[in-house]
């Protein structure tokens, strides 16, 4: 009787499939990685230095550190992107819109600044994160869509504005300070030190969603226009706080 022949799969074929998949993925990612360009440079900084950045699109993170140096690191999506920071005795200015007449894709920034810096950041789209800055002013402006996150802030003037996106504001309010936070569509969350004294005007015309939480027992407030607007004072009212949200919530949290 003739014995049946059993066919075995090719001994190397099973192990080759994961290798081929990995090679295919590498081929797909290689052009993207090759197209990117990285910029990194340090600039000596004096006290009360100013950082100004005007970007088109991309994520921007600014973090304060204990060094007399501004460190700018940027990853550019396109190798044709240009960036020529201007360094003066007053600070560093980066204008991506001026240096690139056409859209060159995302440029993502990570920047380190001294604690006492003034920070002025503007982008057409993309998120902005600013942490632990204690200078005279902090400004974050997103023309279209992008979240804004300001944490550990201790500045006399703070302005944050976007069209679509959330705003997180975690700060100590200073006597005589001015704080303005506005969004058209998104949620605004304010975590403020409980010892801060401030005058408040909060407006949510579409949602009427304004939640004072613990501050409701710490100050005096009046509601207007069917709770679309809240005006009041906490403590000595030493700072001015104004926030408007067209189509989202405004939530206050003492910390």
Q: What residue spans do the PLM features occupy?
A:
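Intrinsically disordered, low-complexity terminal regions
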Residues: 1-255
């Amino acid at each position: 009787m003739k014995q049946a022949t059993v066919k075995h799969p090719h001994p190397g074929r099973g192990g080759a499939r994961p290798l081929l998949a990995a090679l295919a993925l590498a081929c797909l990612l290689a052009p993207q990685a090759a197209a990117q360009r990285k910029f990194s440079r340090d600039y000596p900084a004096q006290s009360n230095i100013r950082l100004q950045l005007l970007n088109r699109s991309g994520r921007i993170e600014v973090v304060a550190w204990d060094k007399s140096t501004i460190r700018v690191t940027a990853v550019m999506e396109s190798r044709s992107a240009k960036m020529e920071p201007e360094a003066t005795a007053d600070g560093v200015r980066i204008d991506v819109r001026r240096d690139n007449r056409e859209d060159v894709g995302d440029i993502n920034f990570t920047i380190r600044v001294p604690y006492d810096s003034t920070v002025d950041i503007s982008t057409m789209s993309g998120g902005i994160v600013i942490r632990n800055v204690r200078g005279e002013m902090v400004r974050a402006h997103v023309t279209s869509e992008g979240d804004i996150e300001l944490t550990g802030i201790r500045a006399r003037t703070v302005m944050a504005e976007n069209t679509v996106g959330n705003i997180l504001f975690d700060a100590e309010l200073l006597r005589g300070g001015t704080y303005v936070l506005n969004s058209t569509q998104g949620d605004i969350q304010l975590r403020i030190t409980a010892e801060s004294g401030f005058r408040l005007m909060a407006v949510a015309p579409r949602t009427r969603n304004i939640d004072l939480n613990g501050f409701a027992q710490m100050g005096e407030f009046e509601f207007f226009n069917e709770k679309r607007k809240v005006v009041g004072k906490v403590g000595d009212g030493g700072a001015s706080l104004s926030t408007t949200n067209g189509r989202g919530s405004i939530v206050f949290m003492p910390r």
